[in-house]
Design a protein with these regions (language model features):
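Conserved RNA-binding domains used in RNP assembly and mRNA/RNA metabolism
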Residues: 1-62
């Protein structure tokens, strides 16, 4: 994954449940991933990440 890729990141919430962030990876460093998606910018601690991968571009609107 690199900045500018469309990604999905599954991460653990403080409650222990998991959730996904889907959108453009706008920054990544040793401690934090920042994903810009429909819910706005999500700052995700790398230690909370369960899985992450690059996904294809969103389909065109109909």
């Amino acid at each position: 994954m690199k900045v500018g890729d469309r990604v999905v990141v599954r991460y653990r919430l403080p409650t222990g449940q998991a959730t996904d962030a889907l959108g453009m990876l706008v920054s990544a460093d040793a401690t934090t991933l920042t994903v810009d998606g429909k819910r706005g910018r999500e700052h995700i601690s790398v230690s909370d990440v369960i899985a992450a991968k690059v996904v294809p571009p969103a389909p065109a609107p109909r």
